[in-house]
Curated annotation (Swiss-Prot):
Sequence similarity: Belongs to the UPF0597 family.
Any one GO molecular-function label of the UniProt entry: L-cysteine desulfhydrase activity
HAMAP family assigned: UPF0597
Stored InterPro entries: Ser_deHydtase-like_asu, UPF0597
Pfam assignment, any one: SDH_alpha
Protein name from the UniProt record: UPF0597 protein YE0448
Species annotation: Yersinia enterocolitica serotype O:8 / biotype 1B (strain NCTC 13174 / 8081)
Superkingdom, taxonomy of origin: Bacteria
GO biological process: L-cysteine catabolic process to pyruvate
């Protein structure tokens, strides 16, 4: 490959990372609806009196069981209400960062009056959230689709104020980055992470800072299923040994506990998901601390982890029946393997072994239990790394794993894009029946 091609690809890689690795407060599916509400509210002459919202089945799935930051409540109605009454329309995934207790009280009162309604709407968009807010005879409707912060339409009192053109400049940039990832290989991701000038990737160290703080919050607070804190207590009872594997599990799970349990601290997300960002970050941070890695080595390992996770997720639907914490942890396996043995072969071998191990974990909606899947995924990642360091791994003779890691990834993603669509529909049907949403 020529230097010119390398330069163009590396520029695209940096753009993709900066686009897909972003701070986010709260689970990003309810946050997408909160953002739509906040933007719509900014066009009303006074506070919203009533909210009508529509979301795609997958967004409904990921918004039903997760705590909305600062509220102590789960579900999309409270997300829509606090977004309308206290959200920052310019905040993106941090729309609820400055939410006040008084605004939460007002939002809960709005729900109690029955002034918030969220319906499920099937359609072509997997990720879709639309909020229509009313004040007297004034109304504003904002539609987000295709991405957690991508506003595609704004309508004020029946007048279309904004509509995203299919070939707008922003869409062209996204498509270019998407095409670059489709044409790239895992080896090129590895080469970029290990060779790009440090100053161009130093920004990724913020992921360690944000997700590390979230992990500490999860260990000291009472969030979600408090899996990280529970595992830590079992150490004191002598039921769990203090070692690198348990550190990886505990610190990753604790960050997810806080994330899904409604902490107001931001997570550094990956591919629109805080849990994916956590799974791609915390195992790498723990191993980097263990080996005494330099700041540059940590940054390169984090870039390798996050970009590999993005590279894999780029072949998946935005939301699907495949638990994406598993694919993010494949990125973490790459980062950990490089820290322990800086060669491409262990990286590729570890990813293949993970595909042969945990590829069947389903996504049954964002919830506190996601922290369990995060802990499972990161422990599998470290196990795969240990095997790879011993030149051992799942081979191309077994299951969906191929001798080539890129083909193994393609095989896994083909399942999510094909047969698992029916699985996704069945999951949504079961969950809708549980809460009488159907």
């Amino acid at each position: 490959m020529s230097n010119t091609t390398d330069s163009a690809l590396w520029t695209a890689f940096i753009h993709v990372i900066q686009r897909d690795v972003q701070p986010a407060v709260g689970c990003t599916e309810p946050i997408a609806l909160a953002l739509a509400s906040a933007i719509a509210a900014s066009y009303l002459p006074a506070k919203a009196e009533r909210i009508e919202a529509r979301v795609s089945p997958n967004l409904m799935k990921n918004g039903m069981g997760v705590t909305v930051p600062g509220t102590g409540m789960v579900g999309l109605p409270i997300a829509a209400a606090v977004g309308a009454l206290g959200g920052d329309p310019d905040g993106g995934l941090e729309v609820l960062k400055n939410l006040s207790s008084q605004q939460v009280v007002e939002a809960k009162a709005m729900l109690d009056r029955g002034d918030v309604r969220v319906d499920m709407q099937a359609g072509d968009e997997i990720l879709f959230a639309e909020a229509t807010l009313y004040h007297g005879d004034q109304w504003a409707c904002v539609t987000i689709a295709g991405g957690h912060t991508q506003v595609v339409r704004i309508v004020i009192n029946g007048n279309v104020l904004f509509e995203l053109a299919p070939e707008s400049p922003s869409e062209q940039v996204v498509c270019h980055a998407h095409d670059c990832l489709k044409q790239a290989t895992a080896r090129q991701v590895y080469q970029f992470a290990t060779q790009v000038p440090f100053e161009q990737i130093a920004f990724i160290l913020q992921a360690a800072k944000l997700n590390g703080a979230l992990s500490q919050e999860g260990l000291t607070g009472n969030y979600g299923l408090h899996i990280g804190a529970s595992l830590m207590r079992q150490r004191g009872r002598g039921l769990l040994v203090k070692d690198l594997l348990s550190d990886i599990m505990i610190r990753s799970a604790a960050a997810s506990d806080a994330r899904m349990g409604g902490a107001l601290l931001p997570a550094m997300s990956n591919s629109g998901s805080g849990n994916q960002g956590i799974a791609a970050t915390m195992p790498v941070v723990v191993v980097a601390e263990h080996v005494g890695a330099s700041e540059e080595e940590l940054a390169r390992a984090l870039i390798l982890s996050h970009l590999m996770a993005i590279y894999i997720h780029n072949q998946l639907p935005t939301l699907s029946a495949l638990c994406a914490a598993t694919t993010a942890a494949m990125g973490a396996a790459a980062g950990m393997a490089w820290l322990l043995e800086p060669r491409y072969e262990p990286v590729a071998l570890a990813i293949g072994s993970m595909i042969g191990d945990i590829s069947g974990i389903i996504c049954d909606g964002a919830a506190n239990s996601c922290a369990m899947k995060v802990s499972t995924s990161v422990s599998a990642a470290y196990k795969a790394v240990l095997m790879a360091l011993d030149s051992s791994g799942v081979t191309g003779n077994e299951g969906i794993v191929a001798d080539d890691v890129d083909q193994s990834i393609a095989n896994l993603c083909a399942l999510a894009c094909g047969a698992m669509r029916q699985t996704d529909s069945q999951i949504i049907e079961i969950m809708a029946h549980k809460c009488h949403c159907d």
